[in-house]
Structure formats: C-alpha cells, structure tokens
C-alpha cells in the first residue's frame, strides 16, 4: 500500500483511535494522535517534542542517530569522520557533502547554500533560536561548492556532530526563509506553519494546537 496522506492531531477520544486508524489505513491514509497537538512546524522556534517530531516529516537533517545510537547519513552522502577525511585531524572542522539530486518539495535543488543559511539563521543573535546549543563553538561556515560545506570550530571539537544532526537541527530552504531572519523569524507564519522540505510529506493544512494534514511529497 502506498501511503497518500497523513493526519496528525490531538487526542480527543482515545477509545476511538484504533478503529479510526484501521479505517484510514485501508484507503491509503494514516492518522497519528498525540496527547497534545503541535503548535509550530519550525524546530528552531520550539524545543517541544511534538513540534520537532511533526516537522521531521517535512524537513530533514544531514544525519540522524539510529535506535542503537549510531550515526546515519540522511541528506548527506556519508557521515564525515577523521578516517574518511571529513573531519580534520585536529578536530577543528567538519566537511559535509550533500547527496546528488536532492530536491525540495517545490522541485528546486537542495544546495550547500541552504545548509549554510540554516546555521546562519539559528545563530543570528536576534533570533532566540531554540536549538542554538547545537551550533555552539562554530567560528565560520564555508560553502565549498554546490554540494559541499565546511564548518569551522573555534577550538577542537571531539564531537562535531551538533549542527545538522537529528530532528532538532534540520536543513531549511534559504529561498523560503531568507526574509525571516533574526527578530523577524517568529512572525513568518506561512514559513513556520508550512516549511518547504525534503521529507516524505508536504503540509496541506495546519491548525495550530489542533490538527495537521499532510500529503505525500512528489519530489
């Protein structure tokens, strides 16, 4: 069965959830019921688990941790390490390379400029970024080419996998958010409620603290 749609919302009648889920699954849709519905789909403006998990269906990081705690490449070609040359021997830089052919849900290409913008977006001092700790110690970020970006730290970083790892630190589209930086970020309702992403779903309707409706991402 190919999943065509997803509905996520707050639980109002838990006793009715199982038959409702079964019925949805039969026509290519699935419902996910949380104890409390998400309020925003931008994890850089919220540290809430419900918001991070909901947004992770749409926007994705360079890498994630699997159930065993191992690093797994996602939008990145592989996980940079000292052994493969992706992390410098002195632990002061890490170089990420995007997979070729990645597209945003609007059909435009994902590039290293989006990766750099994501970091600049969160690190803006007027932003109040909820995930700022993930970018701690970054001195500069250099775009090497369309698919490659190097993060330079201000001191050796034994664990350089804070930025762009996991649902708390996904890549956002520069073209969509470039006018939403700093103090302007919280006011960008359209972007924060319906981010353009690379994930399996696209938001079709979002009623904060009520329900989110998604459809499959054709790209």
Describe the residue ranges of each PLM region.
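Short, well-ordered beta-strand elements
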Residues: 27-37, 77, 92-97, 115-118, ...
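Sec/Tat signal peptide C-region and signal peptidase I cleavage site
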Residues: 18-22
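Aromatic- and charge-enriched surface segment that lines or borders ligand/interaction sites
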Residues: 78-128, 144, 150-152
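Gly/Pro-rich hinge or "lid" segments in bacterial periplasmic/extracellular proteins
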Residues: 66-70, 166-219
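N-terminal lobe/hinge region of extracytoplasmic solute-binding protein
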Residues: 33-87, 120, 196
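Bacterial N-terminal signal peptides
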Residues: 9-15
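Bacterial N-terminal signal peptides that target proteins for export
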Residues: 1-7
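Surface-exposed binding/hinge segments that line
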Residues: 132-181, 200, 205-207
């Amino acid at each position: 069965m190919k999943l065509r749609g997803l509905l996520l919302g707050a639980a109002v009648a838990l006793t009715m959830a199982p038959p409702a889920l079964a019925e949805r699954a039969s026509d290519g849709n699935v419902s996910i019921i949380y104890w409390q519905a998400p309020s925003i789909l931008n994890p850089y403006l919220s540290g809430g688990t419900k918001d991070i998990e909901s947004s992770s269906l749409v926007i994705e990081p360079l890498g994630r941790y699997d159930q065993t705690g191992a690093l797994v490449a996602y939008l990145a070609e592989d996980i940079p390490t000292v052994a493969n040359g992706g992390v410098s021997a002195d632990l002061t830089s890490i170089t990420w390379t995007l997979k070729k052919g990645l597209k945003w849900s609007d059909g435009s290409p994902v590039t290293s400029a989006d990766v750099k913008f994501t970091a600049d977006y969160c690190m803006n001092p007027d932003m109040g970024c909820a995930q700022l700790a993930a970018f701690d110690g970054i001195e500069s970020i250099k775009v090497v080419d369309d698919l490659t970006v190097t993060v330079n730290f201000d001191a050796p970083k034994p664990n350089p996998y804070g930025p762009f790892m996991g649902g708390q630190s996904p890549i956002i589209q520069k073209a969509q958010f470039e006018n939403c930086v700093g103090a302007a970020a919280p006011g960008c309702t359209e972007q924060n409620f319906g981010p353009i992403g690379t994930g399996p779903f696209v938001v079709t309707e979002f009623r904060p603290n009520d329900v989110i409706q998604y459809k499959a991402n054709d790209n």
